[in-house]
Amino acid sequence: MLEHILSLGAYLFCIGIFGLITSRNMVRALMCLELIFNAVNINLITFSNSFDTQQAKGEIFAIFIIAIAAAEAAIGLAIVLAIYRNKNSTRIDQFNLLKW
């Protein structure tokens, strides 16, 4: 059972990395980043439950990661919305505000 859950987490992580590398849309890149965070949460909770069943350290870290991911998503979507208002596009290759 442990191997199946860890392979699910690794599979989700790989899908997130692939999507993050190949996406040209900022919203899709944020979604892939959230998928990576969720894969880390799955593996963290799995390791916590399999190695230390008495304490809930993995679950506490997972809740902390979920809170950080929610803040990251809110800030990221606010940035995407501001860029869309200025450029009328959410494509990553058209985002050149930080270039010289």
UniProtKB/Swiss-Prot annotation:
InterPro entries: NADH_UbQ_OxRdtase_chain4L/K, NUOK/Mnh_C1-like
Gene3D superfamilies reported for this sequence: 1.10.287.3510
Transmembrane segments: 1-21, 29-49, 60-80
Biological processes per GO annotation: ATP synthesis coupled electron transport; photosynthesis, light reaction
E.C. no: 7.1.1.-
Catalytic activity field: a plastoquinone + NADH + (n+1) H(+)(in) = a plastoquinol + NAD(+) + n H(+)(out); a plastoquinone + NADPH + (n+1) H(+)(in) = a plastoquinol + NADP(+) + n H(+)(out)
A Pfam family matched in the record: Oxidored_q2
A GO molecular-function descriptor: oxidoreductase activity, acting on NAD(P)H, quinone or similar compound as acceptor
Bilayer topology annotation: Multi-pass membrane protein
Keyword terms, alphabetized: Chloroplast, Membrane, NAD, NADP, Plastid, Plastoquinone, Quinone, Thylakoid, Translocase, Transmembrane, Transmembrane helix, Transport
Keyword Signal: no
GO cellular component: chloroplast thylakoid membrane; NADH dehydrogenase complex
Leader sequence residues: none
Entry's localization field: Plastid, Chloroplast thylakoid membrane
Family: Belongs to the complex I subunit 4L family.
UniProt cross-references to HAMAP family, sorted A to Z: NDH1_NuoK
Function summary: NDH shuttles electrons from NAD(P)H:plastoquinone, via FMN and iron-sulfur (Fe-S) centers, to quinones in the photosynthetic chain and possibly in a chloroplast respiratory chain. The immediate electron acceptor for the enzyme in this species is believed to be plastoquinone. Couples the redox reaction to proton translocation, and thus conserves the redox energy in a proton gradient.
Subunit structure: NDH is composed of at least 16 different subunits, 5 of which are encoded in the nucleus.
Protein name listed in UniProt: NAD(P)H-quinone oxidoreductase subunit 4L, chloroplastic
Gene from which the chain derives: ndhE
